[in-house]
Amino acid sequence: MNLLEVGIPTVPLRGMVVYPNIVIHLDIGRDKSIKAVEAAMNEDRILAVVTQKDDAVDAPTVHDLAQMGTLVKIKQMLRLPGGIVRVLVEGITRIRLMNITSMDPYYIGDYERVASEFEDDVELEAYRRLVQAKFGEWAEEAKSVTDEGVTRVMELRNPCELADQVAFLLPINNLKRQELLEELSVARRLNMIVGILNMELQISDLENSINNQVRQSMEKAQKEYFLREKIRVIHDELGDKGDPEEEAEELRVKLKALNLSEDVHTRIDKEISRYSRCLLYTSPSP
């Protein structure tokens, strides 16, 4: 039978999931949650954190809380302006919520410690290497993880710790985070993370492709604007000659005198032809 944790001060979390082996700041604002933190500080600093199913619920019952949470140890507590309490906690282990035994003056719960399931060592080692390789690719593309964070992930040898560290760093929604917390099989957890990393890499490739297309389109538009401005300046220098064909010829003579590359020269010459045709269409009949 798994070890029971009875009478643990409990903080329902909104908008986040805490994993074992992770050190994280929590900003606590609700009165009952602050009292739970204070109670834990007065005892052994052990606290249970469980994510709410619906962030909009202000006074959750046991039915409003996820089945799986995390047992944490408070490392530091600070009181901030506005009645907020900021705690630095370190995740210890996964816990399954058995019951909320009290909601006043703060939440108290009974929990069962839940151990991760380690399968075939060879399979786990393969997953560990794959996750670290994929994570390295993603971190290089995303630029959202510090060098220290990347190094820490790359140095991990425990596949369970690796899964929790990478899950914490990935840009995923809380439903997916909770799903990873509740998955006890380390192999399946790592497999899920590989899938998420592959998807993030595909999204990154697509974003880069879109950005390149936009940049090329903007560069083309800027170049065309530059060429038209060149023609306008040449035209202004020549003055209005009246005859579109003569004017186009004079523009070409002026163009030859400019020190331009062959590509730019060809583009401007095409614009002169287009410009000449426009003048022919718009010139008044004699």
Task: Enumerate the language-model features and the residues they cover.
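Short, charged/polar micro-motifs that form catalytic or ligand-binding hotspots
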Residues: 23, 64, 152, 156, ...
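Extended, charged alpha-helical coiled-coil/arm scaffolds that mediate oligomerization and mechanical coupling
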Residues: 157-283
